[in-house]
Amino acid sequence: MNSKNYHQKKRFGQHWLVNKKILEKIKEIAVLNENDFILEIGPGKGALTAKLLDSKIKKLHAVELDNDLINLLNDKFNNNDKFSLQHGDILSVNLDSINKKITKVIANIPYNITGPILDIFIGRLGIIRNCNYEKIIFLMQKDVVDRILSKEGSPNAGALSIRMQLLSKIKKICDVPPSSFSPPPKVFSSLVVFEPINDNLRLDISLEKYIDKLLRISFNSRRKMLRNTLNSILSNEEMNELSESSKVCFKLRPQDISINQWIKLAENCIKIKK
């Protein structure tokens, strides 16, 4: 298929990056080397793919959902030994055979699957721990990136921002206007890099799961004070003990609690519940 004859499908949320400066910027911040095994999610017509394959990398494995693009991509990169292509939905496709080989994940994420993508790929930096990702580079909706970067006390702080910051160091590179895409979306995007927290600083798996539990309970009623959310799992006596041992005021709302305080709350809650 000729790429000029292909028309985007709205159901896939396709907004292809056409800004050459941003394409070059992604390649630059990836800091590619001959040992890199790249996973590219949703290569589209292959503009970014071509940039990455032009670098000294070991392998690029692309996952594409749109069946009409499979032939186009195969025709375009069939003669490149560094390229492999898998047809499937990134939210459900089996990557077990290559997951431990992947060093960097790069994607222009469709807005409609941003949340699930973050859960899968940033989540792997934590509980799953069966990956060697050095860096995850996502081009994604600006307001989601702004939420992820929110600190305690911000109205945008939430379970998403706390979980992402627990598992990775996050750096926003730049904002990207709608005109950089074809067709242009209605909102701005941001280019962001996630790097896994140093192994020595990673949380114990059971502790990480308990933090998730506390976040889920607390942010389900984010306008309520901690005392009025955690009472679903703690008695008044236990809450008083937890507040004192963690040095956290239970009159605070969840968005006002720092990451270190969430860690303390989870650590001490586990002790109390033993």
From Swiss-Prot:
Signal peptide: none
Coiled coil regions in record: none
InterPro entries documented for this protein: KsgA/Erm, rRNA_Ade_diMease-like_C, rRNA_Ade_Mease_Trfase_CS, rRNA_Ade_methylase_Trfase_N, rRNA_adenine_dimethylase, SAM-dependent_MTases_sf
EC number(s) recorded for this UniProt protein: 2.1.1.182
Keyword Transferase: yes
UniProt keywords, alphabetically: Cytoplasm, Methyltransferase, RNA-binding, rRNA processing, S-adenosyl-L-methionine, Transferase
Highest taxon of source: Bacteria
GO molecular function: 16S rRNA (adenine(1518)-N(6)/adenine(1519)-N(6))-dimethyltransferase activity; RNA binding
Main location: cytoplasm
Subcellular location: Cytoplasm
Ligand binding (S-adenosyl-L-methionine): 15, 17, 42, 64, 89, 108
Reactions that this protein is recorded to catalyse: adenosine(1518)/adenosine(1519) in 16S rRNA + 4 S-adenosyl-L-methionine = N(6)-dimethyladenosine(1518)/N(6)-dimethyladenosine(1519) in 16S rRNA + 4 S-adenosyl-L-homocysteine + 4 H(+)
Pfam families named among the record's database cross-references: RrnaAD
SMART domains: rADc
PROSITE patterns assigned to the protein according to its UniProt record, in alphabetical order: RRNA_A_DIMETH, SAM_RNA_A_N6_MT
GO cellular component: cytosol
Protein family: Belongs to the class I-like SAM-binding methyltransferase superfamily. rRNA adenine N(6)-methyltransferase family. RsmA subfamily.
Function noted in UniProt: Specifically dimethylates two adjacent adenosines (A1518 and A1519) in the loop of a conserved hairpin near the 3'-end of 16S rRNA in the 30S particle. May play a critical role in biogenesis of 30S subunits.
UniProt protein name: Ribosomal RNA small subunit methyltransferase A
Organism: Prochlorococcus marinus (strain MIT 9215)
